Amino acid sequence: MSKGRIILLVIAALLVLLVLSARTLAGFYVDLLWFDSVNRGDTFWAVLKSKIFLGAVFSVGFAVVSFISLTLAERLAPADLPEGPEREVVQRYRMFVGKRTRILRLAISIVFGLIVGVPAIAQWQDWLLFRHSKSFGVSDPQFGVDAGFYVFRLPFLTFVVDWAFAALVLVILMTAAMHFLNGAVRVQMPGQRITKSGRVHMSILFSMLAVIKAADYWLQRFELTVSSRGVVQGATYTDVKAQLPALNLLILISLLVAVLFIAGIRWGGWRLPLLSMALWAVVAVVAGAVYPAVIQRFVVQPNVTTRERDYIARNVEATQRAMGLDNVQVVNLTAEEATAADVKASVVPLSDTRLLDVTEMKDRFALDQGQFAFYSINDLDVDRYDVDGRVQQTMVAARELNPDGIPNKTWVSKHLIYTHGCGVVAASASRVTSDGRPIYEDGIDARPQLYVGTEQPGYAIVNTNQVEQACPNTEAEPYAGVAGVKLNSTVRRLAYALTLGEFNLFGSSLITDESRLIDVRDVRDRVSKVAPFLHLDADPYPVVSEGKVLWVIDAFTTTSRYPYAQQANTDNLSASSGLNHTFNYVRNSVKAVVDAYDGTVTLYVVDATDPIVLAWSSAFPGLFTPADQIPDSLRAHFRYPEDLFRVQTNLYGRYQFSDVDQFFNRDAAWSVAQAAPREPELSTGAGDATTVVDETAQANTGDVADANVARFEPYYTMFHSPEGDVDTGTFSLVRPFVPFSSDDTRKELRALMVVSSEPATYGQLKVYVYDGTLPAGPATVAAELSSNPTISPVVTLLDQRGSRVIFGQLQLVPVGKGLVWVRPLYVRPDDSGSKQVFVRRVLAWHDGEAVIGETLTEAINRLFPGANIDLGETVDTGIQDPGTTDPGTTDPGTTDPGTTDPGTTDPGSGVTDPAVLLEEAQSLFDEADAALRDGDLGAYQDKVSEAQDLIAQALVLLGA
């Protein structure tokens, strides 16, 4: 073959390779452009360099070791081949290889080096933490080593040792095969089956393998600090008294085996090393597995408290520190009966009660404020804003782009016209219209275009020759932000066309040199791409700050290697939660903020004491922004994350105790209170019919899953401390506790945990503990509200005829030294597609008495006769929903039952038994249905009106 022909073939092969790899290369280039567009090109290169370094070191390391070993095997080949079955195999190998043995060895070493070494790039995060490790300032009580060793160094060291062991096993197999092909190993020959030189070579390799295993045993000692063998996690009695000595013994034996392999080179061959390896295996089974199991069963379990006492104390202290529970303020209170005078003094706390529910009102917001099908309300969040001169709870939602609602779904429509959402919707959480709808706030001044959001798939191209869809009440204008990548070159457009598989990106005349392609538009994906080592909260929320709409995402740093700390119970977290994984240390160290208009990602460090975030800051200089640069207008809207609070409260019920006996026996332990069911048919059982979420915890384990029913979810509120200024509320998360019981029968309120989101006291955990006679807990209150003879008929009547009743969040309001529980009641059509939701009633409970009112003011005044307060939570706007049917406006409860003496009735009825009236009303409704089926609309209306009159009379008799 001529030289020119060879060159042509090489060029052709390179062209084919280039075509096949074009999309990969384009993807790499597009990634680089994206990182540059968010000013994080340094992060891109830092991660890439770390991956290249690891892949190169481990690949080259394996290739060098294997090449040296294979070269030695080649040079130690016997010159003369004795007669035998293997002779022909060796001769054929030598004839085939000829003078190309060096090239063959090099090729084998490189190929296997890449196979074994390239996967090491997955360890880039552990490697960076290893390089930039920090001190926790706390040493573990067993080995006296700083916790930073376990978090930052041990993971990577363990990987290196495990990799080295597996790599050396592969080298040994490759070397043995080379010795066989060279004639040094003669499997079927009698007598000596390996040459002396081959035996020396293999002995050295086996000795190295034993040394690596000794290093593995040494590292396993430190892994005991997160052992789960005992009653709690960490190195407990069996680990310290049995497993640790066994590992120390195995270290000595493995080193002895290494020495014997070297000694066997000169004396005695392999017999002694092989015998020692057999002994090693026996000791590994007996001392490493059987003996600890025997100690655990026959020494520890019969006397757990005595044996594990010191180790439980270690676990409690470490868990409190690792989970941020080591600085909880405790306030002891005694619940007393509140008075009308207390109510008059508590107008502000009561008026801060939230009437709107984030779950139920999302549909209402979408119906009222969605405006067009191509916009959607994906989530509703609780925040606080200045309303009428006072900071109040506010429901906030972003009006985001809905790709499914885009008309005429062409490429131009999806990517050039409908490119963004429009604005933020807000309503007071504590006020509603007279017909039970939200009161939307005006005057939120912010640029409305939202190019990134919570559910924004695909990409958008701005500044094209196609005008974008303008936000309502605004005119279309060119994009003025910095988000996205400029498509100002043929190379860029071709790269995006290849990566996204869309030819229009390359060929469309609508795209100009000023056009920008904005992709990765989901805010969580955007932050994850910049900082993949952070665990992100599942609930980003919009904040209006300095004329901008900003998305705030709580970001966590976690590890599962904090010595002696208990793993978090994450059973009740959502699948998308950033904390839905195994960990025993957590900090909400970072607030990620994304500009909804220009996509800028800013990572604010809000906990500079966290060694993990400090390590990442060292690894990526410039990636994080210090807390002192957070604008005050933004900081005022930071919220303590719900999922972190869930984890902490799940643990605190037991980990509040430092006393080992109290911790172990759980005599005074707490559980998170049982949930209050939302559906009327589930409410009378006080939570017994709720969904099973956990297994009942055993009293003698470290498990913190306390019960087999759903738990009370934490909620945001303007909390007014019973010990402080009653008119000063702090935006907080609240979650109640009940006394622990393995069968979940205890439902009294034992304590409240409250965590502040206010800038001055952010993250401060406070527990209000109730002593003496315990007040009723939320499950009991919910049951009494639902089964009350005055309330139950109203709920029953509202929950029929095409309507469905849903209970809102059960909220606790301290009034004086007493506790008032408040719960809004919603009515919506019994149609899964309907979005109409109305606040129809408010339930209130105090000291065993339950009432219902059309408004919160009415309910409180009934609960406390003589209070005569006006909370101002209902505003008559005079606006009704056009073209909609209110599923509660014609219900019997709209008549104010407080204006009629309950001992009187309509003179025309002559009936004083409400049960009879309700039966007659039911009969009239049946007759109305029959008339409707016959097409007699006049008779239908008459029957319905008569039935409603009877129901109103029944309610008067019931005092409702």
Mark where each language-model region is.
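Soluble extracytoplasmic regions of secretory-pathway and membrane proteins
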Residues: G4, I11-D934, G938-L958
